[in-house]
Amino acid sequence: MLWAGGMRLGMARILLMLVHAAAACEFGPMPYSVTGIVFRMTKPAALLLNQETARLIQASFKHAKFPNITGERSMRFLGTVAYTLANIQVSDLSIEQSEVELKENDAIDIAIKNVTAFFRGTLTYGYAGAWFLQLFHSVDFEIQSSIDLQINIKLLCQEEQVAADASDCYLSFHKLMLHLQGDKEPGWLKQLFTDFISFTLKFVLKRELCKEINLLAQVMANFVHNVAENFVQDEAIGLDISLASDPLIKANYLESHHEGLVLYKNYSDVLSDSVFSPSLLSESRMLYFWISEHILNSLASAAFLDGRLVLAIRGEKLQALFEFEDTEAQQKAVHLIFQGNSYNDSVAKVWSLALPEISLQPEGTVVKSLVAVEISIFPPGEEPLTALYMEEEITVTIQAAYVEKKLILRPVDSQIEFKVFNCTADPSGNDQSVRNFLQKMISAVGIPEVISKIEPALTSLMNSKGLHLFEIKNPEIITRKRYLIVQLDFSFPNHLLLDFLEKTL
């Protein structure tokens, strides 16, 4: 029976290897050139997450389904003794120590030491004596065990996403002690079952526990992928986070490379000139995200095509823009544009006329856009009129930070060039003072006002994906020529793991 079980386990491993080979991803000769997003987790982060390993192992033990264990043996004077261990359940599980090591180009080695567990169930046994005397008994049992567990997790690419293979799993038993109910059974019976049940039990425990651990590792990998996929999706706009190359395991970090192409209706996105190189990321922080300039450009294009780059300003907000200073030029501009009408009866509409262009530089994120501004007045009881229409090419450099769970965008430089300028009260356009005031106003308060609308919108979007649940420490957003890096440390939110276990198990 054990030989047959070993053969089945061996065949299962062979089939698993064939499945992995069949599901392996194919990549081009230059995978870095098509890499839009890179995720790097360093060893300190792996050590932090390893502290949660105990909960995953406990879940594996408790969720494992143990089959009934049956066997028989011929005994002198007793005849054939048959037994069944049924309704096996785990209780009182404790883990003394868990260690993790990253084995370069191989696996994540997790060594779990001194796992103490009690397996409880019902033992039914019977034997036919030499004088045809048949006796059958049923008694509750408890098995006290002390186990070391070694799991070697390999990271693979399956169906263009990261998959975890934890099939390389070993159990070492330091103790396996059988207790029968109240220890009232004869000592020879206890010794008998301890001797020839233990080997079978070890085999079954290893098979079922390792199977459950491997399943949980795969479910966890899928869960992480789904969370990441949801994080980069907002309504019709999303990112394709398919792998651009096989995931890496290095001595000090784990790393995955993703395409990051924008998904939006019929929008066609192609990346072939990424500047990523592993040397661009260090190992001093827990987590790193490398993002190509191309990704931000494509996201801005999708937002434009989706009609999101539109803003209406009215009432007190509009008044604050036009009265940010009290000068003769300001008073003249307000009089010419609004003609004595109230700000409450006026609306300024701002929108992009063409696809924005984004470039990443050491100074920050440079956004260049052709923008239209239209001020409409709705006098009570009269026909609405367009008081001002202008088009300008605006280039603004923005520096970003993440502080107290909020995204902060700070404009540090801007350039404004008027392309079209039509003021109803000055059709000739000869009054340069109005144009000069508007240019100053747009630079001083107009651009900050637009950015102040973007900040909470993006913060709210990220929080809706659960970012605020993480305790992020000292995050930095660093821009370089054609790419940016987000680097941070973090504390793991325990409730997220519990939520995962509740939903999946």
Swiss-Prot record:
Record's Gene3D superfamilies? Bactericidal permeability-increasing protein, domain 1, Bactericidal permeability-increasing protein, domain 2
SMART domains, per this entry? BPI1, BPI2
- Primary place of residence? secreted
Kindly list the biological process annotations in GO that this record carries: cholesterol homeostasis; cholesterol metabolic process; cholesterol transport; high-density lipoprotein particle remodeling; low-density lipoprotein particle remodeling; phosphatidylcholine metabolic process; phospholipid homeostasis; reverse cholesterol transport
| Pfam families attached to this UniProt entry | LBP_BPI_CETP, LBP_BPI_CETP_C
Which residues form each disulfide bond in the chain?
169-210
Intracellular or extracellular location(s): Secreted
User: Sites of glycosylation?
Assistant: 68, 114, 266, 344, 422
Which GO cellular component does the record give, naming just one? high-density lipoprotein particle
General function of this protein:
Involved in the transfer of neutral lipids, including cholesteryl ester and triglyceride, among lipoprotein particles. Allows the net movement of cholesteryl ester from high density lipoproteins/HDL to triglyceride-rich very low density lipoproteins/VLDL, and the equimolar transport of triglyceride from VLDL to HDL. Regulates the reverse cholesterol transport, by which excess cholesterol is removed from peripheral tissues and returned to the liver for elimination.
In terms of PANTHER family, this protein maps to: CHOLESTERYL ESTER TRANSFER PROTEIN
What is the protein named? Cholesteryl ester transfer protein
